[in-house]
Amino acid sequence: MFQKFDNIHDCSFAEAIRVPVGWGALDKLVRWFYSGELPRIAPDCRWKNMSAEEQLSYLKPYAELSSLAEFWLLEGVKEASLEVVASCLNTSTGASVEFIGFAANLGQWELVEAAVGSVAHLYPKLRDSGQLEQLDEDVLNMLRAEYVRYSQHRGVSY
C-alpha cells in the first residue's frame, strides 16, 4: 500500500530555515499575520528629532520584511513596507543614505528608488561631504539621474 522512495530527500525535516531578517521584521510579520496590516511609523516631530541611527533602526526591519515578502510571495507586505519607508523618508532624510546602502544590499530596488527620491535634492551636499562613498556605482548612478530629474523639474517651475 505504501511505497518507499529511497532517492527522495524530504526537506521538511530541516532543522532551520535561514532568512536574512531580524527580530524587528519578524515581529512586524507576526502582527501582519494577525491583523492584516503592518505597524506604521508615525512621521511626526518625534520621528524628525530622532538621530539617523535611531531612524535607521526603525527602517531596517521594513527592508528585511520586503525582502522576505519577495522570497515567500507574501502579497501586500512588500507594498506596505514601501509605503511606510517612503512616508518616513519624505519627512526626514537623516537615515536615507545608510538606508539606501542597506536596501541595495538586500536587492530591494523599489525601496532604494524611494530613498533616492527623498535625498536627490541633497546630492551635491552629500557628494561634497563624502557621505556617498559607501554606495556602489549603480546606486550612485541612480542618485545622479534622480538629481538631474529634480534639477530639470525645479528649473521649469516658477
Say what each PLM segment does.
Residues 1-91:
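Canonical BTB/POZ domain core
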